[in-house]
């Protein structure tokens, strides 16, 4: 399967993703034709070449003309998407992105999802950005999207709800469970739309070994003083397998600490903190320590870039006086998220492949749990519906 690797050098926003896709070779005319099926009048795509810190890339501006609604409700936006002529898989992806934004906004503002009204995200340009990203992936043949952890920016930003810290609460809500990097340029480097694209479409973490085929640069609107405001997108294929057709080993770190005086609540928090710091996995297992004391083996798996942060999280959240570490090699299957439409809403299915051959498909638990809570049904019912929807579209 082809890879689409995203590097948010200056951040990520919906227009930057569109621009990077066009710079990779997506036909803007084909993109516009598909988006016209949304039936939303008064906009056009302005595509220009632009240099940023000496890097030539593509800049996209969604030019809005005439009177437009000040905001739109989630139901209104989902109805637009459902009635559109977007390709089926792009329609599913767009629906999933908007639903994820709605859930994040509802949690941040303490209102039911049905009462969420989008201001910035409900504007025509954001609707075009989200649906355009889904159509662009369709035109690229739905490569597996992998993204490097983004820097979120710093400072304050003005929104329709008032002045908020950077990153805004909705951005952090959308990126829960994803590795991110604090700091960055003085401003909003990751927009809610950009965060939603990462949350729904991408696996965020260390980029895999690969063979670059084409490279595109999406240039943003703002100018950062210390870096080019670009999103780099690389269309690639996995690096040649080392051995029996797998993707080849990667070197990771196992971090461990033995605990015999740490309350169970803190152990649970330490696992959570390790994952927030960028650990690929974290766990706790019972063990018997010296003098027959019952204890806990706390462990985490991470890459070199996150080793210091994960170690710091283990020290900060537990009573341990030391953290052991040793390098390990891991071979992992190729993985990609594919959104499917169910009667409960859009759910991502994680698909595992080896050398292009599918070995398994598993509905994403967090998506299923959110849909189950909203519908008042058991999680396993949503999981079964998602798996059935995924299998129904296979040849």
From Swiss-Prot:
Alphabetic keyword roster: Nickel
Pfam family, one: Ni_insertion
Family statement drawn from the similarity comment of this UniProt entry: Belongs to the LarC family.
Domain of life the protein comes from: Bacteria
Protein name per Swiss-Prot or TrEMBL: Putative nickel insertion protein
Gene3D superfamilies in alphabetical order: mk0293 like domain, Transcriptional regulatory protein pf0864 domain like
MF terms (GO), sorted A to Z: lyase activity; nickel cation binding
UniProt entry tagged with the keyword Magnesium: no
């Amino acid at each position: 399967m082809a890879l689409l690797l995203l590097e948010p050098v200056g951040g990520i926003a919906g227009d930057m993703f569109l621009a990077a896709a066009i710079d990779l070779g997506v036909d803007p005319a084909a993109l516009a034709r598909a988006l016209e099926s949304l039936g939303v009048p008064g906009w056009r795509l302005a595509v220009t070449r632009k240099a940023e810190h000496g890097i030539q890339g593509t800049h996209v501006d969604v030019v809005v003309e005439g009177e437009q609604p000040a905001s739109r409700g989630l139901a209104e936006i989902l109805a637009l998407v459902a009635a559109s002529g977007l390709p089926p898989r792009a329609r599913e992806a767009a629906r999933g992105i908007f639903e994820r934004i709605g859930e994040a906004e509802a949690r941040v503002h303490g209102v039911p999802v049905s009462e969420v009204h989008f201001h910035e995200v409900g504007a025509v340009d954001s609707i075009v950005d989200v649906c355009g990203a889904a159509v662009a992936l369709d035109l690229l043949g739905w490569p597996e999207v992998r993204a490097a952890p983004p820097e979120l920016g710093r400072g304050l930003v003005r929104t329709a709800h008032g002045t908020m810290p950077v990153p805004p609460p909705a951005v952090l809500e959308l990126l829960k469970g994803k590795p991110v990097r604090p700091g960055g340029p003085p401003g909003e480097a990751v927009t809610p739309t950009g965060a939603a694209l990462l949350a729904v479409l991408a696996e965020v973490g260390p980029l895999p070994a690969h063979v670059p085929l084409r490279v595109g640069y999406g240039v943003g609107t703002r100018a950062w003083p210390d870096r080019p405001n670009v999103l780099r997108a690389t269309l690639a294929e996995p690096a040649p397998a080392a051995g029996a057709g797998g993707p080849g080993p990667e070197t990771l770190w196992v971090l461990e600490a033995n605990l015999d005086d740490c309350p169970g609540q803190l152990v649970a928090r330490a696992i959570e903190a390790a994952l927030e710091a960028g650990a690929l996995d974290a766990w706790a297992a019972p063990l018997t320590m010296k003098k027959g004391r019952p204890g806990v083996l706390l462990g985490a798996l991470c890459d070199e870039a996150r080793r210091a942060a994960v170690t710091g999280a283990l020290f900060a959240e537990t009573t341990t006086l030391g953290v052991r570490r040793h390098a390990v090699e891991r071979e992992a299957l190729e993985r990609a998220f594919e959104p499917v439409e169910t009667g409960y809403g859009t759910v991502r299915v994680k698909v595992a492949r080896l050398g292009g051959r599918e070995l398994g498909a598993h509905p994403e638990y967090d998506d299923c749990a959110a849909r189950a809570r909203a519908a008042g049904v058991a999680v396993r019912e949503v999981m079964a519906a998602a798996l059935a929807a995924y299998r129904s579209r296979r040849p």
